[in-house]
Amino acid sequence: MESALAVPRLPPHDPGTPVLSVVDMHTGGEPLRIVLAGCPEVSGPTLLAKRRYMRQHLDHVRRRLMFEPRGHRDMYGAVLVPSELPDAHLGVLFLHNEGYSSMCGHAVLALGRFALDFGLVPAPPAGTREARVNIHCPCGLVTAFVACEDGRSHGPVRFHSVPAFVLATDLMVDVPGHGKVMVDIAYGGAFYAFVTAEKLGLDICSAKTRDLVDAASAVTEAVKAQFKINHPDSEDLAFLYGTILTDGKDAYTKEPTTNICVFADEQVDRSPTGSGVTARIALQYHKGLLELNQMRAFKSSATGSVFTGKAVREAKCGDFKAVIVEVSGQAHYTGTASFIIEDDDPLRDGFLLK
């Protein structure tokens, strides 16, 4: 007789106890926790309004799923919501240890697979090798192209970004502990500061992660204090998300270039960072180091995972010259879970260690 313990089930709980059901995935090592059920309705006429509503009224959901004991300080999540855009198959709000992002490329790559496999888009016709999924992110509509076989996702996913552009180059910033440091700022659905790790006395491939995090965080705080971020479309998008340290190999080569992204509250991306690759391609194109449709490979110094990226066409974002960037990578499922929240648990809303 099969043991009752062999079949996973929820522990005894009161009928009114909140239950949060999720699917967990990762893209290049960076986790994505997708909420299937248990999140209250997120109100608002637009996706950005829904993002504000969730921050103000439902932030306990983020903390419960991202923080310990159910998550960890580097957990990443997605809440699926209806979109006001007629062409969108789904809308998404991105969750992290500090709050809510405007864009997440690794999540889009994972959500492309998820949307196809879980029936959020119409089943592709027989023989279709790639399905299209329109995902409304807070930064705008992003199209994912999902490799498929017999109607199921199979292999890598690629996406086309919102217009990506450069906000500033060769910006001198006074970084405590490092003196004057030259940084570039570019947008790939979120704004990043880019710095060659060597300028901070670090080797991107061999330095301790803690040292890279400390240096990148110092740059982020310095840029926030000394430079105003602006976005032509919305103030909701006008914030510095983090700093990406690179190996400085921005000139075109077929060899991978290595970087690490530190974002939000010192959160470390395990992947090469999809929106960061988008912004870095825009920066390289802006500097004349890259031509349209020249493919580059980007390697995570954290896990060694690789994304590819290329600028596919020119565009505009307000008065900024921009490019649409294609980013490719592969996401994998890791499991499902159902979490309960007991009223008498003093740590029910989560905690973080630093």
Curated annotation (Swiss-Prot):
Tissue spec. comment: Ubiquitously expressed.
Keyword list, A-Z: Lyase
SUPFAM superfamilies the record matches: Diaminopimelate epimerase-like (SSF54506)
GO MF term list: hydro-lyase activity; trans-L-3-hydroxyproline dehydratase activity
DNA-binding among keywords: no
Presence of the UniProt keyword Translocase in the record: no
Top-level division of the source organism's lineage: Eukaryota
Protein name: Trans-3-hydroxy-L-proline dehydratase
Species assigned in the record: Homo sapiens (Human)
Phylogenetic placement of the source organism: Eukaryota, Metazoa, Chordata, Craniata, Vertebrata
Gene that produces this protein: L3HYPDH
